[in-house]
UniProtKB/Swiss-Prot annotation:
<dbReference type="InterPro" id="IPR055294">
    <property type="entry name" value="FBL60-like"/>
</dbReference>
<dbReference type="Pfam" id="PF00646">
    <property type="entry name" value="F-box"/>
</dbReference>
<dbReference type="InterPro" id="IPR001810">
    <property type="entry name" value="F-box_dom"/>
</dbReference>
<feature type="repeat" description="LRR 2">
    <location>
        <begin position="144"/>
        <end position="168"/>
    </location>
</feature>
<dbReference type="InterPro" id="IPR036047">
    <property type="entry name" value="F-box-like_dom_sf"/>
</dbReference>
<dbReference type="InterPro" id="IPR032675">
    <property type="entry name" value="LRR_dom_sf"/>
</dbReference>
<dbReference type="InterPro" id="IPR053781">
    <property type="entry name" value="F-box_AtFBL13-like"/>
</dbReference>
<dbReference type="InterPro" id="IPR055411">
    <property type="entry name" value="LRR_FXL15/At3g58940/PEG3-like"/>
</dbReference>
<keyword id="KW-0677">Repeat</keyword>
<dbReference type="InterPro" id="IPR006566">
    <property type="entry name" value="FBD"/>
</dbReference>
<feature type="repeat" description="LRR 3">
    <location>
        <begin position="169"/>
        <end position="194"/>
    </location>
</feature>
<protein>
    <recommendedName>
        <fullName>Putative F-box/LRR-repeat protein At3g58880</fullName>
    </recommendedName>
</protein>
<feature type="repeat" description="LRR 6">
    <location>
        <begin position="303"/>
        <end position="327"/>
    </location>
</feature>
<keyword id="KW-0433">Leucine-rich repeat</keyword>
<feature type="repeat" description="LRR 4">
    <location>
        <begin position="214"/>
        <end position="240"/>
    </location>
</feature>
<feature type="domain" description="F-box">
    <location>
        <begin position="2"/>
        <end position="48"/>
    </location>
</feature>
<feature type="repeat" description="LRR 1">
    <location>
        <begin position="77"/>
        <end position="102"/>
    </location>
</feature>
Amino acid sequence: MVDLVSSLPDDLLGHILSLLTTKEAALTSILSKRWRYLIAFVPYLEFDDSAFLNPEEGKQTREGTRQSFIDFVDRVLALHGDSPIRKFSLKCKTGVDLDLLNQWICNVLQRGVLLIDLSMDLGHRCMFIEIFMSRTLVELKLGSGCRIAFGPEHISALPMLKTLTLDSVSWSDSGQLERLLSACPALEALNLANVHGSYPNATVSIASLKTLTIKSVSLSGPAHVFSFDTPNLLCLNYTALFEDDYPLVNLEYLVEAQIKFVLTDRLIKLVSVRKNGLLMLSEVQKLIRGISSVRKLYLSPGTLQVLGQCSQAMPVFNNLTFLVIESSMDIRWQAMPVLLKNCPRLETLVIKGGLVHCVAADCGDACTCISREEKGRSLASCPVKRLEIREFQGTLREMEMIKHFYYCFLCLKEMEIYVKDGRPQFLAPLASDSNPFKHLLGRNVIIKVHGSLT
């Protein structure tokens, strides 16, 4: 069988080896002379020093692991020769010498590598600047442990870079991010994760950017100040404490947005103080107004809670056709009436997390929390045609809300209900039928129940 496989063309064998880990692919070099240099035809090299800690043989010393890893990387790069590399991934937590790391990076850069993915323990040392001078890189990922420091004279254009991911990266000063982004004229996707205190004041100004993901959640340190000057952005995924500020929000052609504000006890107390609360909510309003052109919008429970505090200043979402609301038992729905009124073209509404929420007097007609004669007409005026309920548990309160939606959403044509897996057994259904809503009459609405309430 080995001989039959060995007769295949080199490029085909290289493709087969690329389906293995780099460590497994390198081991095939001992099969025969034919296989010795086939690693050169593998365009994807991925090195992870954790693979050298074999639990079956007992943990090596840190120094032993480091040296074994170094020898392996050196050997593979030597066998690879001058062959082109498409992807180079390096996960190194054992403290390899910085000069050696730089040597490996320069090696793959000289061979026109397209994708580099780095995560390493540099301590207080700064990583090599050569990586920011590549004219071939299409995607760059810098993960935990990477520390960046360079001056204007150390960075040239990264003309081919399309995707940049920075996760838990630290910087020598607050202007580093802007300098890096200014060198990426073709960047289309930017991912900033675990921002913390790395760049408390940052401006993302990229005309070519299409997708932006920011995860900025730190329970300590100052609030962040983000400016978005991305007129051609299509997709925004933003997670942050809602105390952040947004001096500039230029998102004119935004199509899809996910806004996830994180609430803490400290922030809830601050909002309760009128002066602090008004200031923080005015900052939130800047971002919400900036995304008002979206067609598809996702709001987390925390975001829904925050919007309830400033619902009177909520903008009109003239283009919005698809809205996802994630709820929870401790979240009030006071934002829902205004939100639904301000979506004149809404076609699909998805409610995740079930329908049970914190009872409040200001939910209007969005729910059945409190019974009163006049609660508004936000549902009746909403043009939504399709309603989807996720994590439905079948409580009496939820059953009443389904009935409420059925009769109050006047344009409704279809309702899909997804029963939550593992729902508590004490939640007895109102009917043993697979569809307990057949008794609802008078409307031409299709109701589909996914999962069992029995």
